[in-house]
Amino acid sequence: MSVYRTLDEGEFRDLASRILYEDNHLLVFSKRAGEIVQGDKTGDEPLSETLKAFVAQRDAKPGQVFMGVTHRLDRPVSGIVLFAKTSKALERMNAMFREGSVHKTYWALCCAKPSPESALLTDWMTRNEKMNKSFIVKGPGGEAKEAKLKYTYLRSTERYHLVEVELLTGRHHQIRCQLAHIGCPIKGDLKYGAPRSNPDGGISLHARSIRFVHPVKKTEVFLEAPVPTSWKGV
């Protein structure tokens, strides 16, 4: 008998449809806005546990399932999340993330078109834990950490502007904070200056792609997550 909860048919099929890649070492998943990757103070079930239940049920595994979290996405963000299915794969992926050899791109629907259309942003950021918010400060000192990203304007819809972002550092709320600082808050992101919320409570920031060398097979892996259905016209 499984140590995990039993998923109903609808949930099982939904989870299966959102697996972008899987082998004996890794599972790459398309997260929706509102889902959490790892357990937090809300007590809501994280994807790491839901996917353990999924694998246990699909593979009829009676014992424990390993599902290691290699990186996180904020709750209101959608897109690619990579889990490790063995401790060896987790250790190697963690090292690759630390070394900067995992390349991720994000798509953001912004409330204004950036000018210039492409740039490298370098700022100093601090984090306010109580507010769960990051701020840009004038320079180094105290708790400030350097934050770097590259952005490129892609195209516009009737009201919003699609921007591709490559993160060069991994600071708290970095994309949200830096884009807001140049006058381009992300659609739905009230915390960083968007005028209105999204109906689903998420923000229009999407982890679009990931590129890395497989930690065991040593082959290059490139994956993309489809944009949410709510991104009409993008």
What residues fall within each predicted segment?
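RNA pseudouridine synthases
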Residues: 1-234
